[in-house]
Structure formats: C-alpha cells, structure tokens
C-alpha cells in the first residue's frame, strides 16, 4: 500500500487493514551511495542535496520527456517553508540529460505534490493534496518548470477523491487516478482543455465490495490521449491487483481478468508503449506477499496485449515493493524500489533478466523516469541519480 500517497489526515482510517506497514522516512538520514558505478549522483545545489538527506522518504516524483534531454524532479526544499512550518518542495530541472540541474522554488505553496507528468519540454503538470482541506490539487508549468500556476478548481476543496498519479500524453490532455473517499473505490479524472474543465468518470469497472472497499488506482500510463492503462488494487487485501483500460477516451472501460494478477495485492505504477503491429506493451510494478512468511515482495508484470493479460517477469524477496517503473522501449525498463535497500532493478531484454542496484539506506519511495534506452533519472537513496549507459546493462543481441 502506498500509505504516503494518502493525505496524512486520512491514513488512520485505513491503516488498521494495511498489509504494508513500512514507515517511510524514519531511518537515520545518510549520504547517498548506490552500488556499482553506472548510476552517478547528480551535482545539486547544497540546499537541495541537504534537503534530500534531511527530509528523506517523501514524495519525490521525476518525469522525463522521451527523445529530449529534459527532465523534472520534485524534491524537498528545507529553505522553503510552507503551511506555517512544513518543508516545501522545489522543481529541479535538467535540459542536458542530467549533467546539470537548476532548482526553482516556485511550486504552489498551497499543496503537497504527489505526482508529476511532463508532456513536452515546456509543459508539465503536478497533482497532490492541499494543506487546507486535504482535497486534490493540480498545477501547470508552461516554461519548463521555472514557474507554476495553481489550476485547482474551486469545487475540488471538498472533492471525495484524491489523485495518486497523473499522466499527460499531450500538453492539454491529462489523466489522474486515485481512490474515492475512505472506502477504497477507484477514481479517474481527465482534462482535454488544459485544465479548464475536468471530467470525473462514473463508469469505471466494478468488483465485489469488501469491508474496506473494492480497489483504488495507483498509477496510469497513456500511449495516446484516448488510450490508457490504470493499475491498482485493494490496500490491505489479498489480491487480485486490478488493471483497467480504455481505448476511447474513457467512454468505455475494460477490467483485466488475468490469472497473473491473483495473489498480487497491488500494482503501484505502470509504463506502456506502442508495440509493433499496433498493440500496446505495458510493464506494471507492485507488491505481493510471501505465502510462508507474509513479507512483502516487489514484482514486475508484463502485458503484450493492451493490458488484458499479464505475466510475472520479476520478483524480489526484499520485504519491500516497486514504487515506480519507466520503460524507454518494450525491452528497456527500470523500476524503483521502496521499503528495502533494493533501490533499482533494470532489464534490457524485455524482462527475461534483471539487474538490481542496492542502496545504503532503506524506506525510500523511489521514482524513476527514462529519456531513452541508455539515459534514465532516478530519485532514490537520498539523492538524484543519472545513468547514461542503461545502468550498465548489456543490450540484448
């Protein structure tokens, strides 16, 4: 369960049924150090480097625009206090594939950013929860992260849903997913006019209810403005994980009945790409639980048919979970870990084999995004990390 993705005032309502009870950010802060030499620490301004160490384990999403050299990472900023005494956030920007970074403490002070999506080198969107009401919020930049405009509709102040993830396939079309209220039911919202109006979908697939709800959505990936795959599950349940898809802009939705989702509590993130022949290939990252010990195990599932059927391609018995996944191609993916010292896991052969990168800290909510098959950016282990050689993976022959 992504406890830290839920507004802090709402955690207590569901924590009693949680299966993942790992506390984020309580480990003693440490200087960043990943295993190996293929991921290098970004040279950040002292205020941001210090913030990543002293305020470790928070929401630190990263988004790169494929085919460019542009990425944005949202990081804590201890010199930017908001909401009285809370540590604020800043946007770190690179326009040279991670070689240099510039920080901008211009995010709205009215809400805590949980998720980020960049559609172009100029247009990015963030979503999160407001300090005032705990309701959903959204902001946009049109100058590559230098300045941000709060575009939260007034009627969201008491909205009965939250946004855990956002994906913007175009500069004006964005999709957000999360839960509805305290009952763990799914929510999906969409704008097609740059945030002027938003549609809350009421036609999502239903499943039998439990005392703690049906399922919530944690991640979404869209290969076009109309074609998206969203993933999630029931926090505190025993599975199956849930995957819903649309190919017509949300007019209709399909619920995957794949057997591979059974026993998987939740998928936390998903990355989809167009595949040869016109289909869609997706990789979903999440968590299952060992049948003998009950400990959490991070895993990756793959789908070759637009999210309809899935097969497990990776599992790590590390008492943690994969929090984020990014695929530059249908063969090259990196997943970022949480709740363990497995910081990253990557494949260059479509999931047949994986390489892991460990950290010297635990309880990280890792995030990763790839510019290309060779260049990716990760926020994990109290730092921003960059690889320019696909993390040292040997390309598949």
Task: Place the predicted regions along the sequence by residue.
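Accessible peptide chain termini
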Residues: 1-2, 397
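N-terminal export and membrane-targeting signals
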Residues: 2-16
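Bacterial N-terminal signal peptides
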Residues: 13-25
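C-terminal region of N-terminal signal peptides and the immediate post-cleavage residues
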Residues: 22-38
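Residue-level hotspots at or immediately adjacent to binding/recognition sites across diverse folds
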Residues: 33-397
């Amino acid at each position: 369960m992504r406890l830290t993705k839920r507004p802090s005032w709402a955690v207590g309502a569901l924590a009693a049924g949680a299966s993942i009870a790992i506390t984020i950010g309580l480990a003693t802060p440490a200087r960043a150090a990943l295993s190996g030499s293929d991921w290098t620490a970004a040279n950040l301004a002292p205020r941001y480097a210090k913030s990543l160490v002293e305020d470790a384990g928070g929401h630190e999403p990263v988004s790169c625009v494929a085919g460019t050299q542009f990425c944005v990472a949202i990081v804590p900023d201890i010199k930017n206090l908001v909401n009285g005494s809370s540590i604020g956030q800043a946007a770190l920007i690179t326009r040279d594939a991670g070689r240099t970074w510039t920080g901008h403490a211009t995010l709205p002070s009215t809400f805590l950013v949980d998720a980020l999506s960049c559609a172009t080198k100029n247009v990015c969107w963030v979503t999160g929860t407001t300090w005032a009401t705990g309701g959903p919020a959204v902001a946009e930049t049109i100058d590559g992260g230098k300045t941000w405009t709060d575009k939260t509709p007034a009627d969201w102040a008491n909205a009965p849903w939250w946004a855990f993830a956002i994906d913007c396939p175009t500069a004006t079309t964005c999709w957000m997913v999360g839960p509805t209220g305290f009952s763990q039911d799914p929510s999906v919202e969409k704008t097609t006019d740059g945030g002027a109006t938003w549609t809350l979908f009421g036609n999502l697939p239903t499943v039998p209810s439990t005392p703690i709800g049906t399922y919530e959505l944690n991640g979404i990936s869209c290969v076009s403005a109309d074609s998206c795959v969203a993933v999630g599950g029931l926090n505190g349940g025993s599975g199956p994980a849930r995957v819903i898809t649309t190919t017509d802009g949300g007019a209709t939705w399909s619920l995957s009945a794949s057997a591979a989702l059974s026993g998987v509590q939740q998928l936390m993130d998903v990355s989809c790409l167009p595949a040869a022949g016109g289909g869609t290939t997706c990789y979903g990252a999440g968590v299952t639980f060992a049948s003998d010990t009950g400990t959490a195990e991070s895993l990756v599932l793959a789908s070759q048919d637009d999210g309809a059927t899935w097969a497990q391609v990776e599992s790590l018995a590390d008492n943690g979970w994969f929090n984020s996944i990014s695929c530059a191609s249908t063969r090259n993916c990196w997943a970022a870990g949480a709740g363990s010292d497995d910081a990253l896991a990557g494949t260059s052969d479509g999931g047949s084999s994986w390489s892991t990168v460990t950290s010297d800290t635990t309880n990280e909510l890792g995030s990763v995004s790839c510019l290309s098959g060779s260049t990716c950016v990760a926020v994990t282990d109290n730092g921003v990390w960059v690889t320019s050689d696909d993390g040292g993976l040997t390309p598949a022959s």
